[in-house]
């Protein structure tokens, strides 16, 4: 029987020193993305396809793109404020009890008569003053949609969707910080930006909408102002900008929600959407939604396997 010899190549010092041909895949992807951004001749579709391909390459190992089981691995971010509040309240209760006991013992030692309470200080039990839950609107406080600037409104029966939406908003940076509130009747959830987008000057907003009309400093109720043709279609406004400011319903399987886009939020890239040449085209609602989500950078993540 003839014996076959197998040659095994060994790594030499020369091979280890010769690293000029080694290419880092991460650098390649970054270079492709930078080329897509700085190249003005590139078509919008090619740019979006390349971004989607890069996203799929980077996220293929971390996500299954399954709309049913993907939400199970998402942490419910709404529980964090409650847990922190409960922990802080427990620590506050312990601290208050300890301070009360120490002050009582100290005052009893200083008092000439043990039965006299003249030298004892009255300590207010702060623990009895409970703050309302973070995600609950107080009943005595009137909240208008114009104050919350809701991005998404979903009914109470679809509460399982809330963690996934929070994950999308935070991960893709739609807002600096996203949270939701529950109305006082527990009939719906309202997503709204909690930090800098809620500090918008309401008086300036009212002056821009209806000039020459006196208003008080109360918040503007957008639902009541719809009868005054607040969102009346303007031929001078780009159709996509006009479309996103009105709001639109989206049905994702059995989940229905109404999306509102604030044109004053630069994170949604309204200018980029408006620069898309579609003035001479009649776009359907689905095509508009596709263009909006593609330009805002969340089309692939929000779509998954669902049908818009």
UniProtKB/Swiss-Prot annotation:
Keywords: Chaperone, Host cytoplasm, Phosphoprotein, Viral RNA replication, Viral transcription, Virion. GO terms for cellular component: host cell cytoplasm; virion component. It is found in: Virion; Host cytoplasm. Phosphorylated by host kinases. Phosphorylation play an important role in facilitating trimerization and possibly P-L complex formation. Its main location: virion. One of its GO terms (biological process) is viral transcription. Homotrimer. This trimer is stabilized by binding to the L protein. Binds N(0), and N in ribonucleocapsid. Essential component of the RNA polymerase transcription and replication complex. Binds the viral ribonucleocapsid and positions the L polymerase on the template. May act as a chaperone for newly synthesized free N protein, so-called N(0). Plays a role in virion assembly. This is Phosphoprotein. It comes from Tibrogargan virus (strain CS132) (TIBV). The lineage of its organism: Viruses, Riboviria, Orthornavirae, Negarnaviricota, Haploviricotina.
